[in-house]
Amino acid sequence: MMNLLNKSLEENGSVLTAFYIFVAFVALYLLGRALQAFVQAADACCLFWYTWVVVPGAKGTTFVYKHTYGKKLNKPELETVIVNEFPKNGWKQ
């Protein structure tokens, strides 16, 4: 790093080298701001999808389950077949 700085001082002089260093810091600052804007946009995108897709999807799935599979059948003969004939957790007991 010092070798590069010494070479620039020899070839360009102190004023131009200082200007190059200043431009490099400005470029790093602008790069940081661009990355910050990108992260903020990605965060807003994730929040949008979570708010408008994930949460309503989970609520809709819960609603459908409660009003279809989660309901009691009120048919005891069918419930006994379901309980007795199908394996529990994938294993017959």
UniProtKB/Swiss-Prot annotation:
**Residue ranges annotated as Intravirion topological domain:** 33-93
- One GO term of the cellular component aspect? membrane
Q: Does the keyword Transmembrane apply?
A: yes
State the membrane topology. Single-pass type III membrane protein
Key words of the record: Apoptosis, Host Golgi apparatus, Host membrane, Membrane, Transmembrane, Transmembrane helix
Coiled-coil segments on the chain, per record: none
Where is the protein situated, by its record's location annotation? Host Golgi apparatus membrane
Q: Name one GO biological process term.
A: viral budding from Golgi membrane
The principal localisation class reads host cell
Membrane-spanning parts? 12-32
**Cited PROSITE patterns:** COV_E
Q: Which residues lie on this side of the membrane: Virion surface?
A: 1-11
Q: Work out whether the entry's keyword set contains S-adenosyl-L-methionine.
A: no
> What family is this?
Belongs to the gammacoronaviruses E protein family.
Question: Function of this protein?
Answer: Plays a central role in virus morphogenesis and assembly. Acts as a viroporin and self-assembles in host membranes forming pentameric protein-lipid pores that allow ion transport. Also plays a role in the induction of apoptosis.
Q: What is this protein called?
A: Envelope small membrane protein
